[in-house]
Amino acid sequence: MTIEVRNIVKEFGSFRALDNVDLRVETGELMALLGPSGSGKTTLLRIIAGLEWPDSGVVTIDGEDALAHGAAERHVGFVFQHYALFRHMNVFENVAFGLRVQPRKIRKSEAEIKKRVGDLLDLVQLGWLADRYPNQLSGGQRQRIALARALAIEPRILLLDEPFGALDAKVRKELRAWLRNLHEEIHVTSIFVTHDQEEALEVANRVVVMDKGRIEQIGSPGDVYERPASAFVHGFIGESIVLPVEVRDGRVRLGDRDLDLGAQDAAAGPSKLFVRRHDVTVGPSGSGVFEGAVKAVRAFGPMQRADIVLNDLGSDTLIEIDAPRDHSLKVGDRIGLQPQRYRIFADR
């Protein structure tokens, strides 16, 4: 079941939430819409669902004009961040609700509904909670029940709006793996919205990075992480060191000094050098492109994070690097830093 969005524009007063957005979701794909608040990701999801209407543009589902139909006619399963379970209904009745309110001509028999709900509760591994009420469930259990309810009507597509946003970090991580494995079983064309970069990279087949109502990049998790298409994507996904540089005559300058780094075909002028924290090799003073002094060191897990004062930037500017614990960095150490991978983007 393919989804295609072409030239979608949506404005709220003077604010343009979506600016000529084009997107195609392939049959059976699990796609993430990733971006900060206000990037347009939830608005795009709601337009696909039929909960919002664009000012202009085209939305098709399996080749049909979706904008000619309301939300109910699009046969979409929708999962909200805050579950939206009916508190007065037990788990079984919540999952069965969508089946029981279908038009009579397509409604299943009570025996079929019972079997369908039982199968779904087994699928989400919560059959033993069929008689419980929402207030008797954990947050993770409620979200799985909400997903089972969305799947009950056998939707053509499944849309999830920040599905794990209300859960604590440990439960979120568990449910990411669970959702990815579940999708491998059901193969329903699915789109989920998130602002969590790790979540998008871990769960999705493809990631759509959005900012200010536009799509910055579409690609596999590996593509958007390893080959970011813009300064925004590099800065938003992962943790980066960002340095103000200038490209001049094919060389990269930081302050008054030429760096021994290629300009990567960047245009001449003010630019920004992006380096991921873990892509910097730490060595003795004089061994790298940059020189600095260790200002502070903090341990976390197998790594240590150090605040470094670079010679080129002055004492008021710190950068952070990640290094293995066995480097035994100490406050006051003079060190050399060598970027292993980096990107240069024009400073707009």
Swiss-Prot record:
Stored Pfam families: ABC_tran, TOBE_3
Chain residues that bind ATP: G35, P36, S37, G38, S39, G40, K41, T42
Domain (ABC transporter) ranges: 3-237
Keyword annotations of the record: ATP-binding, Cell inner membrane, Cell membrane, Membrane, Nucleotide-binding, Sulfate transport, Translocase, Transport
Keyword Metal-binding: no
Top-level enzyme category: translocase
InterPro entries per UniProt: AAA+_ATPase, ABC_SmlMolc_Importer, ABC_transporter-like_ATP-bd, ABC_transporter-like_CS, Mo/tungstate-bd_C_term_dom, P-loop_NTPase, Sulph_transpt1, TOBE-like
The keyword ATP-binding belongs to this UniProt entry's keyword annotation: yes
UniProt protein name: Sulfate/thiosulfate import ATP-binding protein CysA
Annotated source species: Rhodopseudomonas palustris (strain ATCC BAA-98 / CGA009)
